C-alpha cells in the first residue's frame, strides 16, 4: 500500500515539475534582458501555478487514500486467517492417517476372526461327515424308503416297483426254529452260500374295479283324448280301461328301459 501511494506522488510531482521548469528557464532569460516588469508578473503567475498544483496534488492524495482505505482491512483479516488455513490441513492429514490405520487394523482383526470361525466350523463338519460314513458302513442293509419327488409327473406307484426286490443277509438254518419262511431262505453251511443273497419279489395287489350301475329312467305317457271318450260308448269297458291304465304304463316303461 505504501509503495503504491509513493508511486502516485512521484508521478504527480513529475507532471507539475515539467511546466514549472520551462517557466523558470523563460524567466531567467527575461531577467538577463533587464525586463523587470515582465519578471515580476511571471513570478507572480508561477507562484499561483505552484499553489494550485499543490492543492490539486493534496486533493488527489486524499481521494486516493479514501478509496484505498477500505481494501486495507481485508489483507489484515487474511493474514490472521492464513496460519489457521496452513495448520488445519496438517492436522486433518494426521487425523485421516490415524483413522485409516485404525480402520485397517479393525478389518484385519475381523477377517482373522472370521477365518478362525470358518476353520472351526469346517472341522466340525468334516468330523460329522466321517462319523456318518462310519455308521453307514457298519450298519446292515435295510429297507430303504422311496425318494419323495416333488414333481407331480412321476406318481408314487413307480417307486414301489424298485423296492419289490429286497436282499436278505446270510443266515444259517440252525437259527430257524419252526419258521417256514426262514427254512426256505436259509443255507445249510457256509460252503453252499450263494454269491448273491436271494431276493423276494412281492406281488402287486390288484385294485378293485368299480362298475357303474345303469340308472333307470321312468317315462310317463299322457293319455290321449280318444281313450277318455271310449268309456261313453261301452258301458262295461270303462272300468277295465281305467283299472288297466296304470299297469299298461308300467309295462311300457319297463319295455323302453
Curated annotation (Swiss-Prot):
Glycans are attached at residues 72, 80, 85, 87, 92, 105, 163, 199, 233, 248, 251, 253. It comes from the Viruses. Residues 73-95, 231-257 have a biased composition (Polar residues). Residues 187-198 are annotated as: Binding to host heparan sulfate. Keywords: Disulfide bond, Glycoprotein, Host cell membrane, Host membrane, Host-virus interaction, Membrane, Secreted, Transmembrane, Transmembrane helix, Viral attachment to host cell, Viral immunoevasion, Virion, Virus entry into host cell. One of its GO terms (biological process) is symbiont entry into host cell. InterPro entries: G_prot. Residues 67-257 are extracellular. Residues 204-222 have a biased composition (Basic residues). GO terms for cellular component: extracellular region; host cell plasma membrane; membrane; virion membrane. Residues 1-37 are cytoplasmic. Residues 70-95, 119-166, 190-257 are annotated as: Disordered. The chain crosses the membrane at residues 38-66. Belongs to the pneumoviruses glycoprotein G family. This is Major surface glycoprotein G. It comes from Bovine respiratory syncytial virus (strain 375). The lineage of its organism: Viruses, Riboviria, Orthornavirae, Negarnaviricota, Haploviricotina.
Amino acid at each position: 500500500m505504501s509503495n503504491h501511494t509513493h508511486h502516485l506522488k512521484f508521478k504527480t510531482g513529475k507532471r507539475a515539475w515539467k511546466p514549472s521548469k520551462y517557466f523558470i528557464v523563460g524567466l531567467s532569460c527575461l531577467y538577463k534582458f533587464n525586463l523587470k516588469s515582465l519578471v515580476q508578473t511571471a513570478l507572480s503567475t508561477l507562484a499561483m501555478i505552484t499553489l494550485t498544483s499543490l492543492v490539486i496534488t493534496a486533493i488527489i492524495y486524499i481521494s486516493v487514500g479514501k478509496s484505498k482505505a477500505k481494501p486495507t482491512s481485508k489483507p489484515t483479516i487474511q493474514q490472521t486467517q492464513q496460519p489457521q488455513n496452513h495448520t488445519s490441513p496438517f492436522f486433518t492429514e494426521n487425523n485421516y492417517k490415524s483413522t485409516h490405520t485404525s480402520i485397517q487394523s479393525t478389518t484385519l482383526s475381523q477377517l482373522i476372526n472370521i477365518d478362525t470361525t470358518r476353520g472351526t466350523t469346517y472341522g466340525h463338519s468334516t468330523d460329522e461327515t466321517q462319523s456318518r460314513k462310519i455308521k453307514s458302513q457298519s450298519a446292515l442293509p435295510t429297507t430303504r424308503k422311496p425318494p419323495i419327488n416333488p414333481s407331480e409327473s412321476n406318481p408314487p406307484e413307480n417307486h414301489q416297483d424298485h423296492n419289490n426286490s429286497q436282499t436278505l443277509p446270510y443266515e444259517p438254518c440252525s437259527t430257524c426254529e419252526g419258521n417256514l419262511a426262514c427254512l426256505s431262505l436259509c443255507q445249510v453251511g457256509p460252503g453252499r452260500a450263494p454269491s448273491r443273497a436271494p431276493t423276494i419279489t412281492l406281488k402287486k395287489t390288484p385294485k378293485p374295479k368299480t362298475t357303474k350301475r345303469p340308472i333307470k329312467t321312468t317315462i310317463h305317457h299322457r293319455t290321449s283324448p280318444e281313450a277318455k271318450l271310449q268309456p261313453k260308448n261301452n258301458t262295461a269297458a270303462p272300468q277295465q280301461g281305467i283299472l288297466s291304465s296304470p299297469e299298461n304304463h308300467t309295462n311300457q316303461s319297463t319295455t323302453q328301459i
